[in-house]
Amino acid sequence: MPIQVVSADFAKTATRPEEWPRGATPEIAFVGRSNVGKSSMLNALARRKGLARVSSTPGRTRALQFFDLSYRPTPAARPRAIRFCDLPGYGYAKVARAERDRWTAMIEDYLRDRDVLRAVVLIVDARHPPSESDEDAAAFLVSAGRRLVVAATKTDKLPKARRVLALQQVERALGLARGDAVPFSAVEGTGTDALWARLAALAAEEPQTAEAEPPA
């Protein structure tokens, strides 16, 4: 049964740990290459257009963006709180090196140190094999002890006959079991319920972290 979203609101922007939201609300982070469809995914999950700003300009997100949501896993359940964190996209070459380095440090600090972080959604473009940056991100998250969910976006741009093969390509490249990657299309509205089901289950678990070194 689909998750019922009760409310979804922008919470705050943060660039330093002292600005991160306080409290015990479980968080799910979203990371991926610039222009891979993170904002569209967040809006689809929130059942609210315009919650996260969708831009045609890659690299617009330059800070951590937090969103507070309330949802019911079943119609009879009491509302539960969850927080989404939209991380700056990686792989945007037109950003100055110093700025990219600042983003990288900010993201790595969050992914290592955030004690309420329950899982990270790594978003990849289903039309292409995962990039080296995608593979590095997956390796870093695993080494950090973070629970990883891979979502393959823009499946609507692929012929239906190619979608299964495209997902298998993503899974092989990132070392996932068959069926682990979630196919997602904000245009077709597919994958939202499947992704929500995973995130709600992970939000109910205790956080899990480990010491990590940045990928070489």
UniProtKB/Swiss-Prot annotation:
Cofactor(s) recorded in Swiss-Prot or TrEMBL: Mg(2+)
GO annotation terms (biological process): division septum assembly
Signal peptide range: none
Positions of Mg(2+) binding: S39, T61
Residues that coordinate or bind GTP: 32-39, 59-63, 86-89, 153-156, 184-186
Keyword check for Nucleotide-binding: yes
Domain EngB-type G: 24-205
SUPFAM superfamilies: P-loop containing nucleoside triphosphate hydrolases
Keyword terms, alphabetized: Cell cycle, Cell division, GTP-binding, Magnesium, Metal-binding, Nucleotide-binding, Septation
Record-level GO cellular component terms: cytosol
Record InterPro entries: G_ENGB_dom, GTP-bd, GTP-bd_ribosome_bio_YsxC, P-loop_NTPase
Superkingdom classification of source: Bacteria
GO MF annotations in UniProt: GTP binding; metal ion binding
Record function comment: Necessary for normal cell division and for the maintenance of normal septation.
Family according to the record: Belongs to the TRAFAC class TrmE-Era-EngA-EngB-Septin-like GTPase superfamily. EngB GTPase family.
Protein name: Probable GTP-binding protein EngB
